[in-house]
Amino acid sequence: MPKTVIIPPGTGTPIAPFSPGTLADGIVYVSGTLAFDKDNNVANPDDAEAQTRQVLETIKSVIETAGGTMDDVTMNHIFLTDWSNYQTINKVYAEYFPGDKPARYCIQCGLVKPGFVVEIASVAHIGKT
């Protein structure tokens, strides 16, 4: 099964050996996405609303670069550092998924750098390769 690496225009260099997304068999797999600034530092440290919005915009960019839309998302994997941010993350999340909601799960855990509060990985079915 061939795969295509998805790198949206203007995307910075990842800090680890991964691609922002891959497309295979009509499915877009979006890597775990964090809110980095242009210098690969934490953007909006400890701000759940701003980070969630930035993360979802980045995910949207990957999916749109692959030829899909956020309506094509079938699964989200959400990692948060503190359950006290859960409702804030949900509020922003609902803006990006106003209709039928994709499947998802949330896990509380530590993230790669202090100041990050949310990481999201997504899967979208766009029906083409």
Swiss-Prot record:
**Which Pfam families would you find in this protein's record?**
Ribonuc_L-PSP
Q: Which gene encodes it?
A: rutC
Record's Gene3D superfamilies? RutC-like
Q: Name one GO molecular function term.
A: deaminase activity
What role is this protein assigned?
Involved in pyrimidine catabolism. Catalyzes the deamination of 3-aminoacrylate to malonic semialdehyde, a reaction that can also occur spontaneously. RutC may facilitate the reaction and modulate the metabolic fitness, rather than catalyzing essential functions.
**GO biological process terms, semicolon-separated:** nitrogen utilization; uracil catabolic process
The protein depicted here goes by the name 3-aminoacrylate deaminase RutC
**InterPro entries listed in its UniProt record:** RutC (IPR019898), RutC-like_sf (IPR035959), YjgF/YER057c/UK114 (IPR006175)
Q: What is its EC number?
A: 3.5.-.-
| Alphabetized UniProt keyword annotations | Hydrolase
Q: Which reaction does it catalyse?
A: (Z)-3-aminoacrylate + H2O + H(+) = 3-oxopropanoate + NH4(+)
Which family does this protein fall into?
Belongs to the RutC family.
Q: Which CDD domains match?
A: YjgF_YER057c_UK114_family
